[in-house]
């Protein structure tokens, strides 16, 4: 029952475009898992879709998705806090709560040992479920022996995410024809690197903004007092800020692996502490991957090649009698800027005051949970071959708004308007 209520809360959060600071703090106090940001286990979508205009049916689906739930990427993310607590334990300055946390961290390290960054069983399940819902929601796209063209970055968790979706689709329709690949050849659009934008993202302005916000808003003393008996020891031997962030990351990642059934670290934090740590993480994502003025205001254009590829692939496939499906699997660092480049749900905002992000409804949790995905679903009217092709975009399987002229049905946009607007936007960016 508790698990059921948790997912209901996640669904309510995901569907909301403007969550006030107070309401989100209240949600965290009841369901601390929501503070996990990009470590949030994929929320089950509401299942509600607006009917297409009369006579229109889905004919093609294009997609970019993040890998599913994983372990933390680096062994050091587990070992660094373990070593801090072990040294304190040897010095006899750990509290009972500190000793309990150390035991839990050792269990988490053992579970993740030599699996750092790998897909968890829950991550595999998430992609199976996403593929099943794709098939059930848009059966006309997957009919007969259409082609499913799938590409992944050359990272194993992404490749396995792709394979789990493909296997699920084949289970529903064994006649599907599959092409799947993971090659450095495609990284120019699958996982584009951009030196200019990276330099702006890693600038001192971004770092100073985050550091100064943390000094003003995050008080680590209460947490340290719950872990350590000796204030002087903490002052001399512990990087309280680093330890706080490490423990927050570990508390957040628990929900993504099987160990979630046996332990939690959220009781270590107060709701206020979780909210502040979430705010910091949310600001980090905004400053580095959205249109933050502190990082130049152009970070979403890191996905310009991906969006061009989505458009050209769609035009090519839509010219075929049976367009099929195009799937792409990568990372949150692509999904986030692509979401902002598209301005889904008014996500492409520019604010100098990062304290206002939550009040303005900007939430990275809503955009990049584990297995985050953007689906472009294309509709045609078979009785009117010359009628406009329509497109609908789903963010994490929920209908999203676009900054385009409206049609007769909410969330459905003319493909011609889509191309005109976004190709013009892409042309406005000068490398």
Segments predicted by a language model, with ranges:
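Bacterial Sec-dependent N-terminal signal peptides
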Residues: 1-24
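Signature for phosphate-centric chemistry
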Residues: 22-147, 153-326, 330-431
């Amino acid at each position: 029952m508790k698990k059921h209520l948790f997912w209901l809360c996640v669904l309510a959060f995901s569907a909301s475009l403007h969550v006030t600071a107070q309401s989100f703090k209240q949600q965290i106090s009841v369901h601390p898992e929501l503070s996990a940001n990009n470590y949030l286990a994929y929320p089950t979508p509401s299942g509600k879709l607006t009917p297409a205009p009369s006579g229109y049916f889905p004919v093609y689906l294009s997609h970019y998705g993040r890998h599913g739930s994983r372990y933390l990427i680096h062994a050091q993310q587990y070992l660094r806090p373990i070593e801090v607590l072990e040294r304190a334990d040897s010095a006899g300055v750990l509290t009972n709560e500190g000793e309990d946390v150390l035991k839990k961290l050792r269990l988490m390290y053992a579970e993740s040992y030599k699996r750092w960054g790998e897909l968890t069983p829950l991550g595999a399940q998430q992609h199976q479920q996403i593929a099943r819902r794709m098939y059930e929601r848009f059966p006309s796209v997957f009919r007969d022996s259409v082609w499913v063209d799938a590409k992944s970055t050359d990272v194993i968790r992404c490749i396995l995410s792709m394979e789990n979706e493909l296997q699920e689709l084949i289970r529903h329709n064994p006649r599907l024809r599959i092409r799947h690949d993971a090659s450095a050849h495609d990284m120019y659009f699958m996982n584009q690197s951009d030196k200019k934008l990276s330099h702006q993202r890693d600038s001192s302005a971004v770092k100073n903004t985050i550091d100064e916000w943390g000094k003003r808003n995050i008080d680590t003393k209460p947490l340290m007092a719950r872990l350590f008996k000796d204030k002087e020891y903490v002052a001399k031997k512990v990087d309280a800020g680093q330890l706080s962030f490490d423990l927050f990351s570990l508390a957040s990642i628990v929900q993504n692996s099987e160990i979630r059934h046996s332990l939690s670290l959220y009781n270590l934090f107060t709701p206020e502490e979780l909210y502040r740590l979430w705010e910091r993480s949310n600001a980090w994502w905004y400053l580095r991957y959205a249109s933050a003025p502190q990082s130049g205001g152009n970070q979403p254009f890191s996905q310009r090649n991906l969006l061009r590829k989505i458009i050209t692939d769609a035009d090519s496939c839509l010219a075929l009698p049976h367009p099929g499906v195009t799937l792409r699997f990568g990372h949150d660092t692509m999904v986030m800027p692509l979401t902002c480049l598209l301005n889904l749900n008014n996500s492409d905002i520019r604010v100098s005051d990062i304290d206002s992000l939550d009040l303005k409804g900007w939430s990275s949790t809503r955009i990049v949970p584990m297995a985050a995905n953007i689906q472009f679903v294309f509709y045609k009217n078979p009785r009117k071959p010359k009628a406009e092709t329509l497109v609908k975009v789903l963010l994490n399987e929920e209908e999203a708004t676009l900054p385009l002229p409206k049609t007769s049905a909410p969330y459905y946009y003319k493909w011609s308007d889509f191309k005109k607007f976004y190709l013009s936007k892409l042309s406005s960016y000068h490398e």
